[in-house]
Amino acid sequence: MATPSMLPQWSYMHIAGQDASEYLSPGLVQFAQATESYFNIGNKFRNPTVAPTHDVTTERSQRLQLRFVPVDREDTQYSYKTRFQLAVGDNRVLDMASTYFDIRGTLDRGASFKPYSGTAYNSFAPKSAPNNTQFRQANNGHPAQTIAQASYVATIGGANNDLQMGVDERQLPVYANTTYQPEPQLGIEGWTAGSMAVIDQAGGRVLRNPTQTPCYGSYAKPTNEHGGITKANTQVEKKYYRTGDNGNPETVFYTEEADVLTPDTHLVHAVPAADRAKVEGLSQHAAPNRPNFIGFRDCFVGLMYYNSGGNLGVLAGQSSQLNAVVDLQDRNTELSYQMLLANTTDRSRYFSMWNQAMDSYDPEVRVIDNVGVEDEMPNYCFPLSGVQIGNRSHEVQRNQQQWQNVANSDNNYIGKGNLPAMEINLAANLWRSFLYSNVALYLPDNLKFTPHNIQLPPNTNTYEYMNGRIPVSGLIDTYVNIGTRWSPDVMDNVNPFNHHRNSGLRYRSQLLGNGRFCDFHIQVPQKFFAIRNLLLLPGTYTYEWSFRKDVNMILQSTLGNDLRVDGATVNITSVNLYASFFPMSHNTASTLEAMLRNDTNDQSFNDYLSAANMLYPIPPNATQLPIPSRNWAAFRGWSLTRLKQRETPALGSPFDPYFTYSGTIPYLDGTFYLSHTFRKVAIQFDSSVTWPGNDRLLTPNEFEIKISVDGEGYNVAQSNMTKDWFLVQMLANYNIGYQGYHLPPDYKDRTFSFLHNFIPMCRQVPNPATEGYFGLGIVNHRTTPAYWFRFCRAPREGHPYPQLALPPHWDPRHALRDPERKFLCDRTLWRIPFSSNFMSMGSLTDLGQNLLYANAAHALDMTFEMDPINEPTLLYVLFEVFDVARVHQPHRGVIEVVYLRTPFSAGNATT
């Protein structure tokens, strides 16, 4: 476009094209101007031209992306380091926000990878049904016995007494090819054979393997082009059987040895190894292996080194060699990036670029809404014939005073009475199956047992061990907490994101395909706040970064098993850098460069969290944790939550040998789930500072988070959270005080916010002091005896009898009276703002701090009281400060960065 020369050159910095007035009709422009006061069109009709249309002298300036090939690479056992030479030519500006690492490699997700529920092989077979098979007798000298179904009805004949498969074009009989015929999937399609029509002869195939395998989940690979499975160098033998003592054989079976595998099932009821080839081995019970999706973490958390000692990246100008990336152990790069994304976009939408699919869980699994089942109508199943095949009857007719048989009419099958049927409660079965698969299987390991005659590895972090353990029946069942909305207490402290219903992980796993071995081609963004959005001015720079190869850190699995032990490996073959120059004209770029070279126009970047984090160890079963006294100068407040030690890696090393876990890492990805375990926090300063919280409801230096016994009515929302704590969270997150019914706007109530995740719960429980109350053990619970199984995957046991469970709700003698309340608040960091008035953070001075707390250093003590957890945990505290990087590029090839982290005056939070 022709631009009037009077416009300043920097107007081209707006890269979205022409203004509407420059290409729309004069009449439309005049109308827009005349109605602008009450109908503002603004720039709705701006021309979407992106690149400049004049003063562009080279094709390179117009190019969208450039690929930089590394000048040096270092591939070690635990990391892959690359170095790039960034050459930014004159009159150009490199947009660091557009850069990403393009990484190719190969991935072995290990033997524990199973991207589906159930089994892929014979999934409709009963779980304890055997294949057609032979089994040994107690006396090994006696011939093997057979249990089989001869489904292929045909005549036995020919020179070799084979099963006739049909006739050829000359109407001559064709007999079975023993390598694959008769095929096990073939039989009679109608229902009359065997019931109304007599089957004279039939045949099938039988396994003669030395051990028995249930049909459910059994698989054998083909050994010939017809689908036969006979093992190489073995022969098919024919076995003939008849029901009487005389006559021709009625059935023939082609016995073979085959390599039968169970790739996605395991035994949950097994007999001793010595009996598995005998009749006892026929009733072994199979169950599917648990699903285990494996993929890269959300937004590639853990792949690039941050907060990692000497392994941080480098961005340095060749003229000065000053590194713009400063090594700070307690920067929150990954978590800060996760929360920044969640507050700027809808994280419920998945996007394959950058691997964006946030970890989630099914709320119906975390908090069970047990309203029973709608099973008013019975569910029947009927025989295929639709009638009862009764005894064979003769047709008769009246002949004077007697009844006589009708000639040639003796094949009548008459059933008497109602049609026989079987009943199954589908609704109850589906509900209990849901509870078992989604809740019971994820119970803590101390509430599970190893089935008899099953050997599991001693390493409890392996997939084989986790897969082989079964939960005790009765802990999670259809009658537990019936009529209420309640999370099972034993599951509250179990990571709900390590679940096969984590749709984000499932999506990221499926992006890589459904195979254990795969090639990957990924695009990884830079997250470090100081250089993530930098405008890089002309010069030559060294850009270096390291990428982890530890599978537990960069991959995520459903069960959180140790992927190193279970065989997962990653191999990086190439890393390239893609970057874009701003599509500006040379004159515009040079003007922008001159502006940014001036030290008054330095680029400043704030870390999104702007906090110094601390991890304080909490011993198992501890309920009190005092934080050592430390000095402070000024800060905005605290954010805090609780982490499990086994789920928190040591970020300072490329390979943490003690990190034997691959589930979500709350420390990095924000999947917090232990916030509900805090009871109270007390904060004390030295005597020279007055605590700025006298307008709160409770004592000035103590925040009571939840109260179990609430005699004075301090709790809120039918939960055990105090009104005091609820008010503090509303003020800290939304600046909303106690003003009646008032909810935060949508843009404030995103993924990690307080109200978005606050789940209050209430139920009534029996009073143990009531007469007739017995604290029955789990093994004494009668859960529909005879019609279900005692240990959910084992064979059914028992006989019909009344059930033992909670007393009826309507029984006045044993009514559920004692209230029990609690809450969950996953993903949320508790926040305590530091201000004299929680409804206002105060006015900032030109120094960027509130004068109220810009004091000299003072001692600070904090004491936490929390629920006991029987494993080591960590208190995660974010001291909210002002975390700023100021970037100065005074000359060509020179980049200088000053990191300003106020207010701490001592310790590793000081830059």
UniProtKB/Swiss-Prot annotation:
Induction: Expressed in the late phase of the viral replicative cycle. The modification Phosphotyrosine is found at Y899. The keyword Lipoprotein does not apply. The keyword Membrane does not apply. Its main location: virion. It holds the Pfam family Adeno_hexon. The modification N-acetylalanine is found at A2. This is Hexon protein. Homotrimer. Interacts with the capsid vertex protein; this interaction binds the peripentonal hexons to the neighboring penton base. Interacts with the hexon-linking protein; this interaction tethers the hexons surrounding the penton to those situated in the central plate of the facet. Interacts with the hexon-interlacing protein; this interaction lashes the hexons together. Interacts with host dyneins DYNC1LI1 and DYNC1I2; this interaction might be involved in intracellular microtubule-dependent transport of incoming viral capsid. The lineage of its organism: Viruses, Varidnaviria, Bamfordvirae, Preplasmiviricota, Tectiliviricetes. Gene3D superfamilies: Adenovirus Type 2 Hexon, domain 4 (2.70.9.10), Hexon Major Viral Coat Protein, domain 2 (3.90.39.10), Hexon Major Viral Coat Protein, domain 3 (3.90.249.10). All late proteins expressed from the major late promoter are produced by alternative splicing and alternative polyadenylation of the same gene giving rise to non-overlapping ORFs. A leader sequence is present in the N-terminus of all these mRNAs and is recognized by the viral shutoff protein to provide expression although conventional translation via ribosome scanning from the cap has been shut off in the host cell. GO terms for cellular component: host cell; host cell nucleus; T=25 icosahedral viral capsid. Keywords: Acetylation, Capsid protein, Cytoplasmic inwards viral transport, Host nucleus, Host-virus interaction, Late protein, Microtubular inwards viral transport, Phosphoprotein, T=25 icosahedral capsid protein, Virion, Virus entry into host cell. The record marks G737 as: Involved in interaction with pre-protein VI. Major capsid protein that self-associates to form 240 hexon trimers, each in the shape of a hexagon, building most of the pseudo T=25 capsid. Assembled into trimeric units with the help of the chaperone shutoff protein. Transported by pre-protein VI to the nucleus where it associates with other structural proteins to form an empty capsid. Might be involved, through its interaction with host dyneins, in the intracellular microtubule-dependent transport of incoming viral capsid to the nucleus. GO terms for molecular function: structural molecule activity. One of its GO terms (biological process) is symbiont entry into host cell. It is found in: Virion; Host nucleus. It comes from the Viruses. HAMAP family: ADV_CAPSH. Belongs to the adenoviridae hexon protein family.
